[in-house]
Amino acid sequence: MGSKKLKRVGLSQELCDRLSRHQILTCQDFLCLSPLELMKVTGLSYRGVHELLCMVSRACAPKMQTAYGIKAQRSADFSPAFLSTTLSALDEALHGGVACGSLTEITGPPGCGKTQFCIMMSILATLPTNMGGLEGAVVYIDTESAFSAERLVEIAESRFPRYFNTEEKLLLTSSKVHLYRELTCDEVLQRIESLEEEIISKGIKLVILDSVASVVRKEFDAQLQGNLKERNKFLAREASSLKYLAEEFSIPVILTNQITTHLSGALASQADLVSPADDLSLSEGTSGSSCVIAALGNTWSHSVNTRLILQYLDSERRQILIAKSPLAPFTSFVYTIKEEGLVLQETTFCSVTQAELNWAPEILPPQPPEQLGLQMCHHTQLIF
């Protein structure tokens, strides 16, 4: 909670302005300075600085809560606990949809519908609460320049034709989606760490980052000495900031991730196909074996609360798999992508056992083995 702005701690406006002139904006910035440095910046006595340090420390330190207290607080809170995906079977499995106050990751190969899902959720967050929405605005951070305003309008008109029956409603919804194109790691982190005031002033109810892996894999080569450590440090800071925003404002945060091929030692030595951006040790399996896994490695995978995998079944059908969730079992759904976005083909869901996962379809699109030159690992979903 060190990213909390000093303006929200209870300091006077005059003091906040004085601190901001020295680039001291957050609790972390303040607490990293010594008492002597703070005396110089604020012009206060040692006792005055000590009182400020105690105030800021109390404001950003996590407070002890009992389980009963948390339950009572959530019962008294009238804000929604979930954002519905309008995919009824998926919502049922997730006990309501995408959880507020947590990080939900969507991972899969290119073209399987990750951005389509994000655009669809952007529309849903702006809808009135009686339609399952959050009646708020959206921050959409686009690192791949994949967002399409035309597609947003098309999904809105096709999915909710009765509601979006006038141009005014379409304009209102599109004006609530605030798009930021950030193409470097520093830009993404700066944007995330500056969102607190925007969430308050603009009534932001959903934050989307599409995608996490795009900028990280371009800027960090894990094979270079020191890069892996710096990359993990960046990812930890990014995840911490996003979790703070999700928990502090009880909003859902949706992230997209890419996939990577994980090769055994023998095959990796013959062909340099292992993504350097993934801190994964080579498998000890059979010579020449490989599998497909979510990018960014184990460090990142433990940061997200829920992981949904999108994967191909054939040229038309795709599959959503709940691979990680504190509420739902391993579950899969078949869907297609149409004008109205993602559409489930089956209204019921089935739990997937560990044995059945070993026979689940590959994450990659169907290709002849001679084109791949690899033996795909069918237990992809278990490596998280």
UniProtKB/Swiss-Prot annotation:
Keyword ATP-binding: yes
GO biological process assignments: blastocyst growth; DNA recombination; DNA repair; double-strand break repair via homologous recombination; positive regulation of cell population proliferation; positive regulation of G2/M transition of mitotic cell cycle; reciprocal meiotic recombination; somite development
MF GO annotations: ATP binding; ATP hydrolysis activity; ATP-dependent activity, acting on DNA; ATP-dependent DNA damage sensor activity; DNA binding; double-stranded DNA binding; single-stranded DNA binding
Site (Breakpoint for translocation to form HMGA2-RAD51B): 252-253
InterPro entries: AAA+_ATPase, DNA_recomb/repair_Rad51_C, DNA_recomb/repair_RecA-like, P-loop_NTPase, RAD51B, RecA_ATP-bd
Tissue expression remark: Expressed in a wide range of tissues.
Region of interest: Interaction with RAD51C: 1-75
Post-translational modification: Phosphorylated on tyrosine residues by BCR-ABL.
Known outcome of mutating residue 326 to L: Abolishes interaction with BCR-ABL SH3 domain
Keywords assigned by UniProt, alphabetized: ATP-binding, Chromosomal rearrangement, DNA damage, DNA recombination, DNA repair, DNA-binding, Nucleotide-binding, Nucleus, Phosphoprotein
Protein location: Nucleus
UniProt key word DNA-binding: yes
A single Gene Ontology CC term: replication fork
SMART domains (alphabetical): AAA (SM00382)
Residues that coordinate or bind ATP: 108-115
CDD domains: Rad51B (cd19493)
Superkingdom of origin organism: Eukaryota
Subunit structure: Part of the BCDX2 complex consisting of RAD51B, RAD51C, RAD51D and XRCC2; the complex has a ring-like structure arranged into a flat disc around a central channel. The BCDX2 subcomplex RAD51B:RAD51C interacts with RAD51. Interacts with SWSAP1; involved in homologous recombination repair. Interacts with HELQ.
Function: Involved in the homologous recombination repair (HRR) pathway of double-stranded DNA breaks arising during DNA replication or induced by DNA-damaging agents. May promote the assembly of presynaptic RAD51 nucleoprotein filaments. Binds single-stranded DNA and double-stranded DNA and has DNA-dependent ATPase activity. Part of the RAD51 paralog protein complex BCDX2 which acts in the BRCA1-BRCA2-dependent HR pathway. Upon DNA damage, BCDX2 acts downstream of BRCA2 recruitment and upstream of RAD51 recruitment.
Disease: A chromosomal aberration involving RAD51B is found in pulmonary chondroid hamartoma. Translocation t(6;14)(p21;q23-24) with HMGA1. A chromosomal aberration involving RAD51B is found in uterine leiomyoma. Translocation t(12;14)(q15;q23-24) with HMGA2.
Family of this protein: Belongs to the RecA family. RAD51 subfamily.
Name assigned to this protein: DNA repair protein RAD51 homolog 2
Species in which this protein is naturally found: Homo sapiens
Gene: RAD51B
